[in-house]
Structure formats: C-alpha cells, structure tokens
Regions:
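Conserved substrate/cofactor phosphate-moiety recognition/catalytic segment
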Residues: 23-64
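Glycine-rich phosphate-binding loop used to anchor ATP phosphates in small-molecule kinases
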Residues: 58-109, 124
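Hydrophobic anchor at the beta1->P-loop junction of P-loop NTPases
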Residues: 7
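P-loop (Walker A) phosphate-binding loop of NTP-binding proteins
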Residues: 10, 22
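Conserved glycine(s) of the Walker
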Residues: 14
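A glycine- and Lys/Arg-enriched "phosphate-lid" helix/loop adjacent to the NTP-binding pocket
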Residues: 96-162
C-alpha cells in the first residue's frame, strides 16, 4: 500500500499548519519544496524565486520533490507531503508548455487520495516567502483541482474546520480506507 499522502490545494489554505499538527502526532511529514527553495534562495542570493524566475523555481521544486519522494519510500507509516511533485510539474507545464506532468506523475505515484485545502480567505496571509495575492492562489487551486483527477487521483476537499479536526478527518479517512482493503 502506498503510504505517501499528498496534501495540496490553495496557498494559504492551512496546509503547513495541518502538517505541523500531523507531525506533532508522530507522523512523518515533508515540508513544502517551494518554501524550502525560497528560504535557500533568499539566504544565498539566488534567483530561483517564484517572483524572479518561476520556471527555474518550478524545476528546482521538481528536483526536490523527487528526492523527497524517494526518501519517503523508506518510511513504514504514513508520510504526509505539503505539496509535492505534481504541484511543481503542473506549475512548470502551465508556464512553459513543457509536457512533464504525465510522465513524472506516472513514475512517482502518491496515495490514490489527494487531500486539497480549498481557498480560505479568512486565514490567508502573505509573508516574505509567500508574496502572491489571494486571487493568484485561487487560480492555482482551480488548476490543481482540475489536474489531479486527470492523473487518476481521487480528490478529497478538506473542510474548513480547526486544524486538529482536519488532522482527525484525514487520519479517520485513511483508517477507514485501510480497513476496507
């Protein structure tokens, strides 16, 4: 059984907070590639930033997500990803037209259920690592919500509830699914 679970969706929708909750409960988590890249680039004066060179940023995110995916395969329990390979490949393909999405998705499959955080304007904020506005975040969300089913994933939209309840929702969903197999 594939235990690499992808949590994607709208920027500012509560993904990172949710992953922190899952980590606090003892689950393996993988931090969003984009945030790690932005931090590295800002510290080192690099240009692979989404507001400087989005294609270079997406390519770096793809490389990092592939490495993250390979590392997670060693885990025995659930591993939760804050975004991942598909998000980065979808961004690169949207920007450049380069047909990378299907090939990368086929080679690196996550759990068949993808959990998406919907737009949640009440909690959306910008910060030094997240500079785009909520309209861009919603456009990105709509694109991802359309992409995942075309790649054979079942999309589960997370409810707008407290972070502990969201974590319970995901864990209960996965537990029920595991019992049914």
């Amino acid at each position: 059984m594939n235990r690499s679970v992808l949590i994607s969706g709208c920027t500012g929708g509560g993904k990172s907070t949710l992953l922190a909750e899952l980590a606090a409960r003892g689950h393996a988590v993988v931090e969003e590639p984009g945030r790690r890249i932005v931090k590295q680039e800002l510290e080192g004066g690099g240009a692979a930033l989404p507001w400087v060179d989005m294609a270079a940023f997406a390519r770096r995110a793809i490389e990092m997500a592939i490495a993250d995916y390979a590392s997670a395969r060693e885990q025995t329990g659930w591993t939760f990803f804050d975004r991942g390979l598909i998000d980065a490949a979808a961004a690169l393909q949207h920007l450049t037209g380069e047909p990378v999405l299907e090939k990368l998705s086929a080679a690196h499959r996550y759990h068949p259920r993808i959990f998406l955080t919907p737009p949640w304007p009440e909690i959306y904020t910008t910060d030094p690592e997240r500079r785009h506005g909520s309209d861009e975040a919603v456009t990105e969300y709509d694109r991802l919500a359309a992409v995942y089913p075309t790649l054979g994933y079942d999309v589960v939209i997370l409810p707008k509830i407290a972070v502990a309840d969201r974590a319970d929702f995901i864990l209960d969903f996965l537990s029920r699914e595991t019992r049914q197999q």
